[in-house]
C-alpha cells in the first residue's frame, strides 16, 4: 500500500503548525512537503539579532489567557522558554502629549467616563457618562464597524484617541476597518444578550482580572518555536512558489514556479487571501468570491538597539492616536516591556496602516530618520542607535472588517474535499488564533482523507 502524501503551501506559523499536526496525526510513513519561496521559514514570525540580542520583528507577543501557545510549547518541551511581560503599562500619545492607557477597556472602548478624563475633552467625557440613558438600537448578530458604533455612542474623540491606537497596533488598521465582532467580540456578545448601552456591554465584556501578566513571549524569540516545529514535523521544504493546483481522480497535483509537479492526497493552503484567490480561481469559485473581499494592510518595523542609559519612561510603549504628526503608529520599549537583558536597550517602531503605502515606498533611511525623529518628539531624547534592523510586511495584516466571520464561513464552505485553508485571515490575526485555525484545518482534512 502506498503511503499518503500531503502538501502544505506557506511556511508561516499556520503552515508549520499544520505540518506538525499532520505528523502527529499520521505518523512517520507520511510524506509532508512544504512550499515557501522565502530564504527562511516563519512568515511574519521573524527573529533577528539586534545589538547582540534576539528580537522579534513581526509578532512579538501572545495573549496568555488564550491556551494555544502555552499548550503547544508544553507539547514541544519548550515551556521553560516562555517568558512574560514586566508590569510596565503602555501609554497613548494624543494631542502631542503622553497619557496613561485607561484601565478596564475592551479594544480601547472605555468602561467609565472618568477613566478617560484628560485624554478626551470635557464634552466627550460628559457624552460617555450620559451614554447609558440614551436609547440603543441593536440588532442581534449585526457587525458594525467599530468606528460606527463607538462614534455614535461615545463620540469621534473616543474613536481617534482610544480605539484607533489599539486597533492600529494589532491590525495596522483603524476602527473604520475592523468589525465589532472581530475587534471586541465580548462586547458584541453582551449586546446580543441584551445589554442596554455600550457602557454596559463593555463592562460585561471585560476579561477576568488576570492574576499575572497579560502577554507572553519566548526567550530567544519566536525562532525557537519555528525551529522546533520544523524539526518535529520532519517536512521536506521546497523553496518555490506554487503556481498551479489541480484536482484529479487520485488526489491533487501541484505545480511550482520551477515547473516541477507534485502529487498529494491532501493540501493545506496557509497563504494570505490574495494568494488563495490566485490558486483557487478555477477550482473553488465560492471560496474565491469570499476571499477576494478580504483586504490587507502593510507595515514596516524599525528595530533599534540604543545605549543602555537612554532615558525612556518606565512604560512598555506608546500607541499613537489618529491625526497626530508622528509617522509611527506605535512604539514598543522592548527592554521595558520584557526586561533589560543586554548591554543596550531595544526599541521597536511600527509604521504603516491600511490604505497607505508607507511600508512599500519609504526607504530604509527614511524609516530610520522618522524613527529617530518620533522618539525625540515623544520622549524628548536624542537617540544614536547602536544597531538598526528594518523589516517590511507587505499585505501581511488582514483587515477583519464587518461581516468577516461570514466571509470565512464562505471560504471554508466553498472548498472541495481534501483541501483546507489556514492563516491569519481566517479566525484571528494573532499567533494563538493561527495555531488554532491550523489545528482545525488538519482535523477537517484528516476526516476527509479517511472517507
Curated annotation (Swiss-Prot):
FAD binds at residues 10-15, 36-37, 58-61, 242, 393, 429-431. Pathway: Porphyrin-containing compound metabolism; protoheme biosynthesis. Its EC number is 1.3.3.15. The gene is cgoX. Belongs to the protoporphyrinogen/coproporphyrinogen oxidase family. Coproporphyrinogen III oxidase subfamily. Its main location: cytoplasm. Involved in coproporphyrin-dependent heme b biosynthesis. Catalyzes the oxidation of coproporphyrinogen III to coproporphyrin III. The lineage of its organism: Bacteria, Bacillati, Actinomycetota, Actinomycetes, Mycobacteriales. This is Coproporphyrinogen III oxidase.
Amino acid at each position: 500500500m502506498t503511503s499518503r502524501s500531503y502538501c502544505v503551501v506557506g511556511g508561516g506559523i499556520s503552515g508549520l503548525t499544520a505540518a506538525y499536526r499532520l505528523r502527529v496525526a499520521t505518523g512517520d510513513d507520511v510524506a509532508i512537503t512544504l512550499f515557501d519561496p522565502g530564504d527562511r521559514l516563519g512568515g511574519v514570525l521573524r527573529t533577528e539579532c539586534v545589538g547582540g540580542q534576539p528580537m522579534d520583528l513581526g509578532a512579538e507577543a501572545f495573549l496568555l489567557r488564550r491556551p494555544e501557545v502555552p499548550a503547544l510549547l508544553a507539547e514541544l518541551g519548550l515551556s521553560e522558554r516562555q517568558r512574560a511581560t514586566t508590569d510596565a503599562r503602555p501609554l497613548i500619545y494624543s494631542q502631542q502629549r503622553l497619557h496613561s492607557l485607561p484601565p478596564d477597556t475592551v479594544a480601547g472602548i472605555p468602561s467609565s467616563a472618568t477613566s478617560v478624563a484628560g485624554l478626551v475633552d470635557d464634552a466627550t467625557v460628559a457624552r460617555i457618562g450620559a451614554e447609558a440613558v440614551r436609547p440603543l438600537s441593536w440588532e442581534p448578530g449585526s457587525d458594525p464597524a467599530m468606528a460606527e458604533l463607538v462614534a455614535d455612542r461615545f463620540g469621534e474623540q473616543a474613536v481617534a484617541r482610544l480605539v484607533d491606537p489599539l486597533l492600529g497596533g494589532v491590525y495596522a488598521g483603524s476602527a473604520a476597518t475592523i468589525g465589532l465582532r472581530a475587534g471586541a467580540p465580548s462586547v458584541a456578545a453582551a449586546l446580543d444578550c441584551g445589554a442596554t448601552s455600550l457602557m454596559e456591554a463593555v463592562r460585561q465584556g471585560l476579561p477576568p482580572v488576570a492574576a499575572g501578566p497579560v502577554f507572553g513571549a519566548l526567550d530567544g524569540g519566536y525562532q525557537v518555536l519555528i525551529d522546533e516545529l520544523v524539526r518535529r514535523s520532519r517536512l521536506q521544504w521546497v523553496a518555490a512558489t506554487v503556481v498551479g493546483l489541480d484536482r484529479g481522480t487520485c488526489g491533487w497535483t501541484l505545480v511550482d514556479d520551477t515547473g516541477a509537479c507534485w502529487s498529494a492526497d491532501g493540501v493545506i493552503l496557509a497563504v494570505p487571501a490574495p494568494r488563495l484567490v490566485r490558486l483557487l480561481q478555477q477550482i473553488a469559485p465560492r471560496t474565491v468570491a469570499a476571499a477576494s473581499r478580504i483586504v490587507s494592510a502593510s507595515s514596516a518595523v524599525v528595530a533599534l538597539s540604543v545605549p543602555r542609559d537612554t532615558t525612556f519612561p518606565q512604560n512598555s510603549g506608546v500607541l499613537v492616536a489618529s491625526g497626530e504628526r508622528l509617522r509611527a503608529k506605535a512604539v514598543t520599549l522592548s527592554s521595558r516591556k520584557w526586561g533589560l537583558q543586554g548591554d543596550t536597550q531595544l526599541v521597536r517602531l511600527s509604521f504603516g496602516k491600511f490604505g497607505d503605502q508607507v511600508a512599500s515606498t519609504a526607504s530604509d533611511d527614511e524609516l530610520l530618520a522618522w524613527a529617530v525623529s518620533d522618539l525625540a518628539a515623544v520622549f524628548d531624547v536624542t537617540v544614536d542607535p547602536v544597531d538598526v534592523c528594518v523589516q517590511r510586511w507587505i499585505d501581511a495584516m488582514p483587515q477583519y472588517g464587518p461581516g468577516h466571520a461570514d466571509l470565512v464561513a464562505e471560504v471554508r464552505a466553498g472548498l472541495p474535499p481534501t483541501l483546507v485553508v489556514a492563516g491569519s485571515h481566517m479566525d484571528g490575526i494573532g499567533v494563538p488564533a493561527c495555531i488554532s485555525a491550523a489545528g482545525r484545518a488538519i482535523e477537517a482534512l484528516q476526516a476527509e482523507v479517511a472517507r
